[in-house]
Design a protein with these regions (language model features):
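A conserved regulatory-domain signal marking ACT and ACT-like small-molecule sensing domains
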Residues: 1-139
Length: 139
């Protein structure tokens, strides 16, 4: 029976980090179903949803702990289940671009939360506007 584990890992950004994590998954017999990976400052963060049987995931939990100890990664894993599809809701995509200021993400999250709107996926970044150099926030 297919079981799932959610894995979160963060560590110093370096070449081969994704390879090392996925090698452990493959060697344990797991399959990456979904992932999000990004550099945040000098750190590299990974989120993965991995499928496998009970034995695969038990072995993976142990091997991830070893990888964390040997490589300086902070690794957290948690067993989970497939998220049931939400047929009672309509999916929306929201794009926001504004001047960057403290609390923008918090305000947007509060707007959605106060209206009972779940956030399924979110990605933000800051940058300087091309012609003016103004600090910008994009969601």
């Amino acid at each position: 029976m297919k079981q799932l584990i959610a894995i979160s890992a963060i560590g110093n950004d370096r070449t081969g980090l994704v390879y090392d994590l996925t090698r452990v998954v493959v060697e344990c017999g797991g399959n990456v179903l979904e992932s999000r990976m990004t550099a945040l400052g000098n750190e590299f963060a990974v989120l993965m949803l991995v499928a496998g049987n009970w034995h695969t995931l038990a072995k993976l939990e142990g091997e991830l702990a070893k990888l964390g100890e040997s490589s300086g990664l902070t690794v957290i894993s948690r067993r989970t289940e497939i998220r049931p599809p939400r047929t009672d809701m309509v999916s929306y995509t929201v794009d926001v671009v504004c001047l960057d200021q403290p609390g923008v993400l918090h305000s947007l999250a509060g707007f959605f939360s106060s209206r009972g709107i779940d956030i399924g996926d979110i990605s933000t970044r800051t940058y300087n506007a091309a012609h003016t150099g103004a600090p910008m926030f994009s969601l």
